[in-house]
Design a protein with these regions (language model features):
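A cross-domain feature marking catalytic cores of carbohydrate-active enzymes
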Residues: 38-40, 66-68, 101-105, 129-131, ...
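C-terminal extensions of enzymes
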Residues: 235-278
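Short, flexible active-site-proximal loops enriched in glycine and acidic residues
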Residues: 1, 17-29
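Shared catalytic-loop signature of beta/alpha-barrel
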Residues: 123, 134-148, 152-252
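Metal- or metallocofactor-binding catalytic centers and their adjacent structured scaffolds
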Residues: 1-17
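Metal-dependent enolase-superfamily TIM-barrel catalytic cores that perform enediolate-based chemistry
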Residues: 33-141, 145
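Proline-centered loop/turn at the N-terminus of a beta-strand
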Residues: 21, 35, 98, 148, ...
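Conserved, mostly hydrophobic/aromatic
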Residues: 6, 19, 64, 102, ...
């Protein structure tokens, strides 16, 4: 939202004026460095997904998130295809790393209730956004089951996130700082989530989320999107700003104690990747 963008920019400016990184303005460092989970593994050919997972395993990520490619309209055959891919990824990453699963609101309540018993044996850390974001009762019902449910990236306010927590609709809260009102609103949500003993793992990577994670004990890890190609959405900001830390060395991110603000600047060096039509 527009107010989110303005709020994030103001925090960046305050940090630059104070000569301090934003995470210090938010309370300071709560962890030596930030553990990250690998967020890619889009549904595709099984051998390609396993090859991607094998390469990512070399980097030291604490977890791996994969996406489902099949939903209710695909019937039992689609269920089997979903399960094949989850099994293939779990086979590569083993049982010492977390496995996260995302449906991105592509399922309905009935389909999800049929899938969960089949997924339970893979011991996922969470099942993300299985149904449409507004189905609060559905989320609460699913969250009473054996697999923790995560969500919140499509909430646009403190109130919306508070309702998720009050209704015990999620076991992991994943607000999007770009939507809920920026860093100011995110900090309020963090406090409410901590009071409910629900961990917060902000949606997507992005520097403002890393600062929030660094400054909050209740934010244990960060989502990390490795940059392969231009992807309009979660990765586009990597081509507009420079200065984001790289987690590809050991699966952890570090923030500079001496870099003021968010620590990023606008760049035009990737313009050749974009085709501009007038």
């Amino acid at each position: 939202t527009a107010i989110s963008a303005i709020d994030i920019a103001i925090w960046d400016l305050m940090g630059k004026l104070a000569g301090k990184p934003v995470f210090k303005l938010l309370g300071g460092r709560t962890k030596e460095k930030i553990p990250c989970y690998y967020s890619k593994l889009y549904a595709g050919p099984i051998d390609s997904m396993q090859a991607e997972a094998e390469e990512a395993m070399k980097k030291g990520y604490v977890g791996f998130k994969t996406r489902f490619g099949y939903g209710p309209r695909d019937g039992m055959a689609g269920m089997r295809e979903n399960l094949k891919r989850v099994e293939a990824v779990r086979e590569v990453i083993g049982w010492e790393r977390d496995l996260m699963l995302e449906a991105y609101m592509g399922w309905n309540l009935d389909y999800t209730k049929r899938m969960i018993p089949k997924l339970e044996k893979f011991e996922p850390r969470w099942l993300e956004e299985p149904v449409i974001a507004d189905d609060l009762r559905g989320y609460a019902e699913l969250n009473r089951g054996p697999i923790p449910i995560s969500g919140g990236e499509h909430e646009y306010s403190l109130l919306g996130c508070a309702q998720l927590l009050q209704e015990k609709a999620v076991s992991v809260l994943q607000y999007d700082t770009n939507r809920v009102g920026g860093i100011t609103a995110a900090q309020k949500i963090n406090a409410v989530a901590e009071a409910h003993q629900i961990p917060v793992i902000p949606h997507a990577g992005q520097m403002h989320n890393y600062h929030l994670t660094m400054a909050n004990m209740n934010c244990p890890i960060s989502e990390y999107f490795p940059v392969f190609d231009v992807e309009v959405g979660n990765e586009l900001f990597y081509y507009i700003f420079e200065g984001d830390p790289d987690a590809d060395d050991d699966g952890f991110l570090q923030l500079d104690d001496n870099l003021p603000g968010l620590g990023i600047t606008i760049t035009d060096k990737h313009l050749e990747h974009f085709e501009i039509e007038e």
